[in-house]
Amino acid sequence: MNGLELSRAFYEAYGAPMLHEQFPEMERLVAVGLIGSGSECLGFDDEVSRDHDFEPGFCLLLPDEGAADRRTAFLLERAYAKLPKEFMGLKRSAIAPVGGARHGVLRMADFFTEKVGAPDGVLTVDQWLKLPQQALLEATGGELFRDDLGEVTAIRAALKAMPEDVRKKRLAGHLLLMAQAGQYNYLRCLKHGEPAAAQLAVNEFVKSCMEVVFLLNRTYAPYYKWSFRALRRLPKLALTAETLEYLLTTGNDEELAESKYDMIESTAADIIDELQNQGLTKAICGDLEKHAYSVNDGIEDGDVRNLNILYTV
């Protein structure tokens, strides 16, 4: 049983009855689920994950004080704290993890302010441009078990829909970094006798390539620890995971370097094919830099288009 399944089972066994019996007037106002930080919200938790922050628990998200006053929130917190301390052989933690409590009673506005800087999830263009994909994933990942009002569901749905101009700006910046690091600087660093710098170039190529692949899939990239696991599950370009892993985990002697450069070019070609499939580029070549500027040229908002191409990276 993974964390999401554990959370739902704990809620159904104890949380739902607690709400129904002790807070019947709040049942339709409270959104319940497991959302926010943690591998369990992504379905990536495994046996290793159980050594920290793994416990039966769920989130109770309250509307503003006009609908749920402070006293009600306090009573709900106290009732949640009194739920069984152990469930299915797993104990609930008595202390909050680093970064604050992940379960229990939260205000909707506080949750979304912490994750994306907006209590209602309505972001400015600049916020969209600057927010890390991980922050957007934490705001939209996990699962809601109940949301009668639909308010949290609506906010999460809006945050999943990155504006197209923003997606293009992010793509353009990372495509340019892929070109600089992989297609241009990798072999040049080796010719300069700088193998460590060459590996840094590989790292930059891989990091930006992963950002591009998630953007092309219209989904958000997770914390780097889970990036490869998430990459392998994507519907498009999932096979790049194997190539990128090889680039990161092999050396840079002369024979390997030529092979790795061929892989960089092959990966670039796959990315370009998908850019063309989505109508994002008008360039016709294998140079990712030219495609980066073509993607940027396709941004409709002149203010966003005219920002430095690396503004989002």
Give the residues covered by each predicted segment.
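Hydrophobic, Leu/Ile/Phe/Ala-enriched alpha-helical segments that form helix-helix packing faces
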Residues: 15-23, 76-84, 271, 275
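Helical scaffold of the NTase/Pol beta-like nucleotidyltransferase catalytic core
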Residues: 1-33
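Active-site nucleotide-donor binding segment shared across nucleotidyl transfer reactions
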Residues: 20-65
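Conserved nucleotidyltransferase catalytic core and NTase-mimicking acidic/glycine-rich helix/loop elements
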Residues: 134-305, 310-313
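A generic structural motif
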Residues: 62-67, 192-196
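Conserved NTP/Mg2+-binding pocket subregion across the NTase superfamily
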Residues: 69-190
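Ligand-binding pocket scaffold of soluble enzyme catalytic domains
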Residues: 42-46, 57-59, 86-90, 194, ...
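Basic, alpha-helical terminal appendages of large translation-related enzymes
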Residues: 1-2, 67-68, 264
